[in-house]
């Protein structure tokens, strides 16, 4: 690897989180379960001091700077990829709420409880902003207060780690993927059948597979999310698994494979 490339990870934690979906169900604003790339880039922007959304129809500074950054996300302390959610009701008596009956707007939001994610970044320290991001993460420093999707859901991080021995994974053996990964087709035909078991064996966890369609970036013409299908699983996959050419798989040691998008 280029000596100026650094692969690091850090564990993001919050008491609550809300990654707003564009749709509403029975009057409730829904949240994505997983931390997606656009939301992560916003957190990175806060850490390094880049500006956010300021003007309608203009992409935020942090997104313009980090859109091509390779990242990976691994859920922590989840129930097979799922986090506990609770619907919280807010009363809004200002602004547009004055047009509502009684002058009070009731907002209901599905909220993640105690979400935590290990975030991997592939940084180029020749770039001044990425170098500053690296230094801030490793020293627990942020220019602005980062949050888990909403201003009131402050986030902190622990366990910043640098991987000195990481290498490109060449699909020369069967493997498990520690992070979320993008799928191009059904992954079921690539499962190593002998790795499947429904009940725990000794210290092993029952196998599971979790799917979610997540934002991967912004459509710059319509200023809406672009999406991709993601998988999170502890299943062993065969080396014939097909992957998106725009992504990169890395072996970071201790039999851990991650996909960076």
State where each predicted segment sits.
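Sterically constrained small-residue positions within well-ordered secondary structures
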Residues: 1, 62-64, 110
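N-terminal, Lys/Arg- and Ser/Thr-rich interaction peptides
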Residues: 1-29
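Extracellular structured ligand-interaction cores
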Residues: 5-7, 68-70, 114-118
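Residue-level recognition of well-ordered beta-strand positions that form the cores
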Residues: 11-13, 72-74, 120-122
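Short loop/turn segments at secondary-structure transitions that flank enzyme active sites
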Residues: 15-18, 50, 77-79, 125
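Glycine/small-residue-rich interface belts in oligomeric ring/scaffold proteins
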Residues: 23-95
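Internal, well-folded beta-alpha domain core
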Residues: 76-261
């Amino acid at each position: 690897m280029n000596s100026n490339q650094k692969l690091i990870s850090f564990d993001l934690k919050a008491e609550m989180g809300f990654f707003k979906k564009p749709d509403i169900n029975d009057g409730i604003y829904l949240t994505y379960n997983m931390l997606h790339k656009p939301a992560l880039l916003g957190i990175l922007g806060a850490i390094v001091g880049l500006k956010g959304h300021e003007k309608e129809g203009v992409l935020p500074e942090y997104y313009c700077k980090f859109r091509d950054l390779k990242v990976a996300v691994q859920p922590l302390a989840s129930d097979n990829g799922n986090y506990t959610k609770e619907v919280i009701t807010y009363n809004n008596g200002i602004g547009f709420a004055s047009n509502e009956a009684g002058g009070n707007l009731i907002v209901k939001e599905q909220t993640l409880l105690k979400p935590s994610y290990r975030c991997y970044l592939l940084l180029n320290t020749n770039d001044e902003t990425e170098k500053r991001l690296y230094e801030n993460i490793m020293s627990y420093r942020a220019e602005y207060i980062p949050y888990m999707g909403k201003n009131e859901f402050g986030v902190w991080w622990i366990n910043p780690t640098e991987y000195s021995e990481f290498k490109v994974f060449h699909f020369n053996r069967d493997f498990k993927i520690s992070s979320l990964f993008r799928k191009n087709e059904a992954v079921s035909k690539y499962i190593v059948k002998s790795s499947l078991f429904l009940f725990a064996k000794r210290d092993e966890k029952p196998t599971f597979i979790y799917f979610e369609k997540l934002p991967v970036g912004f459509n710059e013409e319509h200023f809406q999310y672009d999406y991709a299908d993601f998988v999170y699983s502890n299943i062993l996959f065969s080396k014939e698994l097909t992957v998106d050419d725009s992504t990169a798989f890395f072996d970071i040691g201790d039999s851990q494979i991650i996909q960076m998008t």
